[in-house]
Every structure is written in C-alpha cells, then in structure tokens.
C-alpha cells in the first residue's frame, strides 16, 4: 500500500485511492507491506509453496519498482508477472497456471471487474482456488498451513 496510508483505516485508504488525494499513491517504489505479509508468505514458501507475484503495472520500469519494494521488505523470492498494455488480467495467469490465487477485492478501482480470477476462462477457474481478501486488509487472517488455504476459497 502507499506509504502515507500506514496509520489509516482500511476504508479511509480505499477513499484515498478513489479520490486520489495522496501523492504517495503514485510513488510505487515507496510502497509498504500490509500487516505481516512477508512472514506469512515465507511460512508458506517454507512449506513448499512457489510464490509468484502479479503486478498491476504495465511497464517493466514500474515492475522494477515492485521488485525494489519486495527486496526492501524481504518478501520471499518469486517471479513478478505483469500484463502488457493491451493485455487482459487473465493472460499472465494463463501462463503461470497457479493452484491458488490470493487477490484483493479491488474495491477502490471497480470491484470484481478489475480482479483476475473472475476474468479467467471457466476451464481455468475450475483448476484454481480463488481466495479474495478485502482490499488493504492483508492476509494475516489466512491460515499458516498451506494445506488449509483451500478452506478459504471464495465463490464469485
């Protein structure tokens, strides 16, 4: 999330994004993690999960800013995937074919129409567990054991 959102409630952060009222929103290299996300992802990786990241950015220049943030905050190593300018969200996922997608509900930018999973082909959706979290709420509430993640599947 943008650095100036640190002390605010989830709803206020969503409002900041919708209204574009904070200059740090577009300062991608200064983004900060939500909650204990690095700890949770490291725990899952240590259990054998292969962690991949899907960037919202459309250019390699901005994806490199994501990489800076991931390294700075010691996120587990993983490939960062992103879509090209004219591509839909589903294309990077169709290449990766993950077992599980954890994504936020995109409340501040239009909801499920901006999400990845709802835009996947039905035959791919049937092979992937979708877990949706509230935007800016983090993943701390998800189980530590990767075998329990499927219990948190979200129907869209």
Protein language model features and the residues they cover:
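Short, acidic loop-to-helix structural element flanking the phosphoryl-transfer center
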Residues: 22-51
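C-terminal cap/substrate-recognition subdomain and adjoining C-terminal extension
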Residues: 62-156
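Asp-based phosphoryl-transfer active-site loop
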Residues: 1-23
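Residue-level signal for short, function-critical loop segments
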Residues: 57
């Amino acid at each position: 999330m943008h650095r100036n959102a640190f002390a605010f409630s989830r709803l206020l952060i969503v409002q900041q994004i919708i209204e574009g009222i904070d200059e740090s929103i577009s300062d991608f290299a200064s983004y900060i993690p939500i909650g204990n996300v690095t700890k949770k992802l490291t725990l899952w990786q240590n259990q054998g999960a292969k962690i991949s990241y899907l960037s919202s950015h459309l250019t390699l220049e901005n994806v490199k800013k994501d990489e800076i943030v991931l390294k700075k905050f010691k996120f587990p190593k993983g490939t960062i995937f992103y879509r090209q300018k004219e591509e839909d969200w589903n294309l990077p996922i169709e290449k990766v074919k993950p077992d599980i997608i954890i994504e936020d509900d995109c409340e501040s930018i239009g909801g499920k129409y901006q999400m990845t999973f709802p835009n996947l082909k039905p035959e791919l959706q049937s092979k992937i567990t979708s877990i949706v979290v509230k935007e800016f709420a983090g993943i701390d509430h998800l189980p530590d054991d990767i075998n329990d993640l499927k219990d948190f599947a979200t129907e869209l």
